[in-house]
C-alpha cells in the first residue's frame, strides 16, 4: 500500500505539557515517520507519514486530546506532500 502524509495543526493547551514527546511515542507505536514541532501561535504542528490506517489512527488520537496533560480545542488537517521522513522526530 502507498504511504500517505498528513499535517495536523493542534490547538489548545498543547505546549509545555509533553505533547510533542507523547505524539512521538504514539507515532512510533504506529510505525509512522514525520515530526512534531511547536509553532509560534501556541499550536503544535504534527506531520505524519506512513500507512493510511496508521495515519488515521494518530489523527484520531490527536483529536481525542493526546496526552492527559494536554487540552485539545481543535485539530486542523491537511494533506502533506512529503512522505520520505526517517523516523519521527521532535523539531525545535
Swiss-Prot record:
Belongs to the acylphosphatase family. It is an enzyme of class 3 (hydrolase). Its EC number is 3.6.1.7. PANTHER family: ACYLPHOSPHATASE. The active site is at 20, 38. The keyword DNA-binding does not apply. One of its GO terms (molecular function) is acylphosphatase activity. It comes from the Bacteria. Pfam families: Acylphosphatase (PF00708). InterPro entries: Acylphosphatase, Acylphosphatase-like_dom, Acylphosphatase-like_dom_sf, Acylphosphatase_bac, Acylphosphatase_CS. It catalyses: an acyl phosphate + H2O = a carboxylate + phosphate + H(+). Residues 5-92 form the Acylphosphatase-like domain. This is Acylphosphatase. It comes from Pectobacterium atrosepticum (strain SCRI 1043 / ATCC BAA-672). Keywords: Hydrolase.
Amino acid at each position: 500500500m502507498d504511504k500517505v502524509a498528513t499535517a495536523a495543526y493542534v490547538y489548545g493547551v498543547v505546549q509545555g505539557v509533553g505533547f510533542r514527546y507523547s505524539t512521538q511515542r504514539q507515532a512510533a507505536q504506529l510505525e509512522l515517520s514525520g515530526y512534531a514541532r511547536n509553532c509560534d501561535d501556541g499550536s503544535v504542528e504534527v506531520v505524519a507519514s506512513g500507512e493510511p490506517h496508521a495515519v488515521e489512527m494518530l489523527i484520531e488520537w490527536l483529536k481525542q486530546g493526546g496526552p492527559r496533560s494536554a487540552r485539545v480545542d481543535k485539530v486542523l488537517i491537511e494533506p502533506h506532500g512529503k512522505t520520505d521522513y526517517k523516523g519521527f522526530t521532535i523539531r525545535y
